Amino acid sequence: MSGPAADAAYTRPMADPRLDLHSLLLCDHAITAQDGKVSAIGLFSQINVSRLPTTYGRLFIVAVLEADPGEHQVTLQVVSPDGRPLLQRPPQMKLNVPPNATTANIVAELKGLQLKELGRHRIELRAGDRVLGSTPFLVSLIWQGRQAAKA
């Protein structure tokens, strides 16, 4: 084989390594044991606030991925109900999946999340421009005594 077709065969980019999201959880705390097992404590999908804007002190994000061995770059982003990214500097993580492994876990702590509106938000996990998956969470206003908190 010779000519342009042969040249194209040698310069064609290789397929991206496999990186598939299996689970994406929000929780109060997460622990990675010495053997690699992850414990997620206090799973939730709703954040109750008494007023807006507010700062949510701390939460953990746990992701379980199926991945080819090697290095992978992923980014977490919080997205508002109208689709705006909330994190100006979203956490970027490097995963090193060892040979013979097929899965990888991420445990990320997020402190001081600024919430400015009610409704369905989501956490997205991305590899470059590709959204691997997301999980929703609802921001709701709670009542305090006889008065509704002012939003």
Can you say where each PLM-predicted feature lies in the sequence?
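Contiguous segments within soluble domain cores/interaction surfaces
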Residues: 4-6, 12-118, 122-151
